Amino acid sequence: MKDRYILAVESSCDETSVAILKNDKELLANIIASQVESHKRFGGVVPEVASRHHVEVVTTCFEDALQEAGIVASDLDAVAVTYGPGLVGALLVGMAAAKAFAWANKLPLIPVNHMAGHLMAARDVKELQYPLLALLVSGGHTELVYVSEPGDYKIVGETRDDAVGEAYDKVGRVMGLTYPAGREIDQLAHKGQDTYHFPRAMIKEDHLEFSFSGLKSAFINLHHNAEQKGEALVLEDLCASFQAAVLDILLAKTQKALLKHPVKTLVVAGGVAANQGLRERLATDISPDIDVVIPPLRLCGDNAGMIALAAAIEFEKENFASLKLNAKPSLAFESL
């Protein structure tokens, strides 16, 4: 039987990535051109800068992916691309490249939801058992998603305000940490103690919605008041206290979701899934009867490998798009 190859493109934010998947599960290449250094001085992603960088490197990413995979364009069976959610300018660069490549090589185009990509990155670990529940945590999203079968997604809980990754970056900026701050806060938290009191919004309420704006504001106020009074704060304890509050909220809502939606598998994915503290709490707090599946670190951040793994599901369903496909920066799971 002929091998099947899918080329995938991801450009929803500040990573330009092209990957090649063989036979639905083997990643032969996952080229990632990061822009982190370009955005550090701004303390966050600047959309116009991100779009320009995508334009500069996307062609090279295509070439490098094919070379690393050891195949040529004529070996491919489909092209997949992230069409939302994300920054509209950034999405359009990747989509233009993917559509042009698909047209030139007479290949079908597979539209992929960026968050479905994060979720399906777990397929790199093992074949997933359905139905399952997913906790998706990133810089732009915090969602609990019920997946009844491959490709069938339903959001059952989400943040009312800030995404968890966004909260990490904002408090990191207040402390003078380098963007993105999540990894450094996690490392500092492991050296400190939970000594400062921060709120755990809606942690006892029965619904599955999150809120991190109150926690962020409490952190900023504590830091500001200490500065005004000339009081010293222990950075490690500050990070430990902030992270403890975040993880208490995430774990409480996830456990409630598991009671409301009994499943045997929990996927935890997205950039924040790389957080060591979160991984430790999942190991201790989630019932051993639940199979917790977390993508490897290399697939937690934005990358085209996860888009390819999600695209394999859509390929089986023959969910192809025309070359008129447009970017949907606010795309939700329900509209997939």
Swiss-Prot record:
Localization: Cytoplasm
Binding site for substrate: 136-140, 169, 182, 186, 275
InterPro entries: ATPase_NBD, Gcp-like_dom, KAE1/TsaD, TsaD
E.C. number: 2.3.1.234
One cellular-component annotation, GO: cytoplasm
Cofactor: Fe(2+)
Reactions that this protein is recorded to catalyse: L-threonylcarbamoyladenylate + adenosine(37) in tRNA = N(6)-L-threonylcarbamoyladenosine(37) in tRNA + AMP + H(+)
Residue sites binding Fe cation per the record: 114, 118, 302
Example of a GO MF term: iron ion binding
Enzyme class of the recorded protein, top EC level: transferase
Major subcellular location class: cytoplasm
Alphabetized Pfam families for the sequence: TsaD
Keywords of the record: Acyltransferase, Cytoplasm, Iron, Metal-binding, Transferase, tRNA processing
Gene Ontology biological process terms, A to Z: tRNA threonylcarbamoyladenosine modification
Cofactor note: Binds 1 Fe(2+) ion per subunit.
Function of the molecule: Required for the formation of a threonylcarbamoyl group on adenosine at position 37 (t(6)A37) in tRNAs that read codons beginning with adenine. Is involved in the transfer of the threonylcarbamoyl moiety of threonylcarbamoyl-AMP (TC-AMP) to the N6 group of A37, together with TsaE and TsaB. TsaD likely plays a direct catalytic role in this reaction.
Family membership: Belongs to the KAE1 / TsaD family.
Protein name listed in UniProt: tRNA N6-adenosine threonylcarbamoyltransferase
Lineage: Bacteria, Bacillati, Bacillota, Bacilli, Lactobacillales
